[in-house]
UniProtKB/Swiss-Prot annotation:
Protein's name in the database: 1-deoxy-D-xylulose-5-phosphate synthase 1
Co-factor binding details: Binds 1 Mg(2+) ion per subunit.
PANTHER family tied to this protein: 1-D-DEOXYXYLULOSE 5-PHOSPHATE SYNTHASE-RELATED, 1-DEOXY-D-XYLULOSE-5-PHOSPHATE SYNTHASE, CHLOROPLASTIC
Binding-site residues for thiamine diphosphate, renumbered to this chain: H79, A120, H121, S122, G152, S153, N180, Y289, E371
Transmembrane spans: none
Family, as annotated: Belongs to the transketolase family. DXPS subfamily.
An individual GO BP term: 1-deoxy-D-xylulose 5-phosphate biosynthetic process
Protein encoded by which gene: dxs1
Family matches, as HAMAP family: DXP_synth
Key words of the record: Isoprene biosynthesis, Magnesium, Metal-binding, Thiamine biosynthesis, Thiamine pyrophosphate, Transferase
PROSITE patterns assigned to the protein according to its UniProt record, in alphabetical order: TRANSKETOLASE_1 (PS00801)
Function (record text): Catalyzes the acyloin condensation reaction between C atoms 2 and 3 of pyruvate and glyceraldehyde 3-phosphate to yield 1-deoxy-D-xylulose-5-phosphate (DXP).
Amino acid sequence: MFPNDKTPLLDKIKTPAELRQLDRNSLRQLADELRKETISAVGVTGGHLGSGLGVIELTVALHYVFNTPKDALVWDVGHQTYPHKILTGRRDRIRTLRQRDGLSGFTQRAESEYDAFGAAHSSTSISAALGFAMASKLSDSDDKAVAIIGDGSMTAGMAYEAMNNAKAAGKRLIVILNDNEMSISPPVGALSSYLSRLISSRPFMNLRDIMRGVVNRMPKGLATAARKADEYARGMATGGTFFEELGFYYVGPVDGHNLDQLIPVLENVRDAKDGPILVHVVTRKGQGYAPAEAAKDKYHAVQRLDVVSGKQAKAPPGPPSYTSVFSEQLIKEAKQDDKIVTITAAMPTGTGLDRFQQYFPERMFDVGIAEQHAVTFAAGLAAAGYKPFCCLYSTFLQRGYDQLVHDVAIQNLPVRFAVDRAGLVGADGATHAGSFDLAFMVNLPNMVVMAPSDERELANMVHSMAHYDQGPISVRYPRGNGVGVSLEGEKEILPIGKGRLIRRGKKVAILSLGTRLEESLKAADRLDAQGLSTSVADMRFAKPLDEALTRQLLKSHQVIITIEEGALGGFATQVLTMASDEGLMDDGLKIRTLRLPDRFQPQDKQERQYAEAGLDADGIVAAVISALHRNSKPVEVVEMANMGSIARA
């Protein structure tokens, strides 16, 4: 179907400047070819499909009407930008999307001058576009800044904070509200099309300004009545009153798949003398591809697929994902405790709470893209005696940090944080990596921070959280599947701040936090084979640190390796602080910390990302050998309580 279809018009387009040379009547054909190319490319690489197909015509129209890159297009999130990438000189690399050394799945300033602003997290576009618009105004330039934001992103307060400050930018700021949730049928009739084109035209806007001037000179009572009549009439016609209260001219709704509507409206908006302007564009996710239109949720993000049938490649069978283990254990806990409630921020499927909702619909709260609210809402529930589990991706928990400090930790409220997608995440790259939660959580007084080494440990930790009421507690776990351990049997309530010694050795000790335990054990096998007897501990808790176990290991080994799936400032800092405070390094103890590097790692397969960071068996062995070759000293054997024969430097 698509792979062999010809794309004669698209083949001629290397830049938007060439697109703008096309006859307007040929843009429909270009859009059809662009849709085929987008489907074909995502069929090869996988990625976000539905949202991109929904903005094909809008993307063509924006690059046709606006003088990009001089006029800045600022895309929100970036899931929908594959067609934009194809039209802006990157078609030859579009089948490298989300691959190692390939194109990003989001906009990146380093990738193209047409990517005016990087994106991946939601609801940032209007703020960034306002920055471009104000820079244009300060420079006495007429360059436009166009924010393209979806209706889902408008659930976040940041979008309204930006709009509330946007009036000063005037005509240079344009916001395109891409509404792909509304039914497209009602707003695309002849009357709606006429109204949208009329309202966006210069004569209408000038007439409205004149009438506002007249109203302002009326007696107070008449003026109020006139304004209310105007608001009522415009609200009935276009629904724009809310946005106008924020200082925007409102235009729409416009059929986002009808180029004959889109282009005249965008031209009128581009040439308007006043602003800022919001254009309400109605689109369908998956437009033009039957499988995606029929199952929008399943084609938002896809694996590689057969573009003819729409069938997606299935992942090979394996152990359950950490997310599903968390969800299933939480359901078990909630069946026993009706005080357990859950909160997520527009990610019920990603966090596994869609399953929880099937059992307890009244106890699952999806607050939209509102992490700040989610954290404080959870704090309120905890203060009222409930047991909230606040379930967020690590990368999005960053957005609620002040609330973590002010509303949870200071008040020592027993909010349970399930921090999903902790560590490196593969194809989504740096913007979605869960690199920093360890560092910013262990710094909070009262906070307990756990990380499981496998799926059974995660189930134990969820069970423990359900029974912990002394203050806030968190568990972080990665994207992907477990290691295949059994989940049968009763779950344990873990003693807070206690790790476990997995393997006894004499010379090297590996203190592992999280799912690097398997690699740590592989490294220990290799080190043992080289005559370097190695202990391995599953530390379980970054905070409170198991000081007794840590102290024993530091006193009895020559080389200490800490390993964690987080950035500088996390688990290793806890170990080093204790060692420094107690003088445990004064006699030449060698400690090496393995953690994520102090840079943003690009997209790749997870295992390669961790190997590049040195967080695999090879990296552990290399760190030990390097440490031993620097000022080595002999090792003597001592006896330690509960640990058997352990080596001491």
